[in-house]
Amino acid sequence: MDNTLKFADSHEWVKDNGDGTVTIGISEHAQELLGDVVFVDLPDTEDEIEAGESFSLVESVKAASDIYAPISGEIVEINEELEDSPELINEEPYEGGWIVKVKMSDASELNNLKDAEEYLSSVEED
């Protein structure tokens, strides 16, 4: 796992791209809980998202799960690969399975997220 990733308690990860944008996906732990992903309901580019609010839905053979925005901003790119290959979330949760890229409205929100070590400790306690 990339140690530069930040995590929300709701199991989303955030990668700071260094240009005012972040990439968002769901963690390895989350995809393991979901099981085989069969569909991802992607938002539209230019949609505004608010930290803590649902912006996407991932359906698996076990359940449908809302995906929550770990930070606020405007969606600038969606991972269209997920439309035909939703299983990328299972196979590469931190690489090809990313969900959206967002232009942050407030970069300080990143400080509210856990680092990789804190996140791993929290899921091991579950």
Swiss-Prot record:
| N6-lipoyllysine carried by residues | K62
Q: Quaternary structure per UniProt?
A: The glycine cleavage system is composed of four proteins: P, T, L and H.
Q: What is this protein called?
A: Glycine cleavage system H protein
> Which terms under GO biological process does the entry name?
glycine decarboxylation via glycine cleavage system
* Regions that span the bilayer: none
For this UniProt record, give its keywords in alphabetical order, as a comma-separated list. Lipoyl
Q: Which InterPro entries match?
A: Biotin_lipoyl, GCV_H, GCV_H/Fam206, GCV_H_sub, Single_hybrid_motif
What cofactor does this chain's UniProt record say it requires?
A: (R)-lipoate
State the family named in the UniProt similarity comment for this chain.
Belongs to the GcvH family.
**Domain of life, source organism:** Bacteria
Q: Name one GO cellular component term.
A: glycine cleavage complex
* Functional summary from the UniProt entry: The glycine cleavage system catalyzes the degradation of glycine. The H protein shuttles the methylamine group of glycine from the P protein to the T protein.
Q: Which residues form a coiled coil?
A: none
Q: PANTHER family from the xrefs?
A: GLYCINE CLEAVAGE SYSTEM H PROTEIN, GLYCINE CLEAVAGE SYSTEM H PROTEIN-RELATED
Q: How is the cofactor bound?
A: Binds 1 lipoyl cofactor covalently.
Write down the species.
Vibrio atlanticus (strain LGP32)
Indicate the segments forming the Lipoyl-binding domain, all copies: 21-103
